[in-house]
Structures are given as C-alpha cells and as structure tokens.
Regions:
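A short structural micro-motif
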Residues: 38-39, 192
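C-terminal transmembrane bundle of multi-pass solute transporters/carriers
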Residues: 11, 15, 22, 48-219
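Glycine-/small-residue-rich active-site loops that bind phosphorylated ligands and cofactors
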Residues: 27, 40, 73
C-alpha cells in the first residue's frame, strides 16, 4: 500500500525513518545486523597493530598483510554475491548464517597463534562480512517503500559512522584484559545476535516472501 512520507525538517524525517524501522521486525533486525557489526565486529581493525606487533612480532609488514587479508576476502565476497545472488535458494538463512560465520571467524582469528592462521581467518572474515552485508543492503533497498527508503538507508549508513565507538569499546576491553579477549568477545556478540535472529521464521523467509508484506501494518 502507498505510504506517504511527510515533509519536515531533517530531524523529523530521521525520526520518521526510525519509527518505521522500530515498528517492523524484519527491517529492525536487518539494521541490528549492521549495528552489531559496527560496534562489535569490525572494531577488531582497531586492535590489528597489537596483533602484528605484540602477538606475531611482524611489525608494519605484518600489519599491512593483516589489513590486506581482509581486503582480499571482501573483494572475493563482493564478486561471489554478485555472481550467485539470484541463485541462492534460501537468501534469509544464508544471510544470517553469514553473519554468524563472521562472528565465529573473528573468534578464530582472536586465538590464532601465528600469522599463518590469522591471515586465512581474516580473508574469510572479509568474505563473510561483505557477503552478508551486501544482502542486508539489497533487502533494505528492495523492501522499504519508496517514500521512506532514503530515511531507512540513512539509519543503515549511521551504523557505519558508529565504527569509532566500536573501536573505543574494543580498546577499553583490550586495555582491561587483552586484545585477544576483546576480539573474542566482539565475535561472540556478533555470532550470538545472528544465531538468535536465525530462530525467526520471518527472517529466514526473506527472499521467498516479499519483504513489504512484513511491514504492511505500518501507519
């Protein structure tokens, strides 16, 4: 059904998008996946210098390799999802499993004893991250009514602007315990959130059922 977007100031438009998401479980869950990724997942990047210098004794070269590993995985993930997106049998389930996989891979990386373990783990982290977040973005753009799409996408973009806060949290935990523990906890939170959402039949059905049908009650 047609959902008129009200004119108003920027704050009012933002709050309208926030209200829309808050009243729709599917879109709230998709935004939550991006939010948890920013606050607890990708915050690991802040701690990579510690891994390169203190744990792997590889200095700036190791730091560069760790960063590059994520980039390579992200590139492969982008190419993969672009190639097989229309052939994924269960898009919703695949998305949530990708998010859970990201958390588990971060936990694996956090305990990696050597660069030989850390680099492949980060390649897979980059792959999983891009693979599932591309799907999140696609479902939001396809499912949100035209009049509200910009407002909801602004919330999605806001999640990425919270990366520094995630880095601050990771840094504080690393200072209190250590960097391995900080990334382990972050990965566990990301995985737990995804696995919890995986129990929802509505989310697993994304891609089989038109997403707008899940939001028809909005007014």
């Amino acid at each position: 059904s047609h959902i008129p977007a009200r004119d108003g100031h920027v704050l009012g438009q933002f709050l309208e998008g926030l209200s829309f998401v808050a009243h729709n479980f599917v879109f709230a869950s998709l935004i939550a996946l991006a939010l948890f990724n920013s606050l607890f997942g990708l915050s690991y990047v802040t701690l990579l210098p510690i891994f390169a210098d203190c744990y792997f004794a590889s200095g700036s070269t190791g730091f560069g390799l760790l960063n590059a590993a994520h980039g390579v995985g992200a590139l492969v993930g982008t190419l993969t999802i672009a190639t097989i997106a229309t052939r994924i049998a269960r898009p919703g389930t695949t998305l949530l499993m990708g998010a859970a996989g990201l958390g588990i891979l971060l936990m694996t990386f956090s305990q990696g004893p050597t660069m030989a373990v850390a680099i492949p783990a980060l390649v897979l982290v980059g792959f999983s991250n891009t693979f599932y977040l591309t799907q999140v973005s696609t479902f939001i753009q396809q499912g949100v009514p035209d009049q509200l799409r910009g407002r909801v996408l602004s919330l999605y973009s806001l999640c990425w602007n919270l990366l520094p806060i995630g880095g601050l949290l990771a840094g504080a935990l690393a200072a209190a315990v250590d960097a391995r523990f900080a990334i382990l906890c972050g990965g566990a939170v990301v995985a737990a959130n995804a696995l919890l959402l995986l129990t929802s039949a509505r989310l697993r059905a994304i891609g089989h059922v038109k997403v707008p049908s899940a939001v028809s009650g909005y007014s």
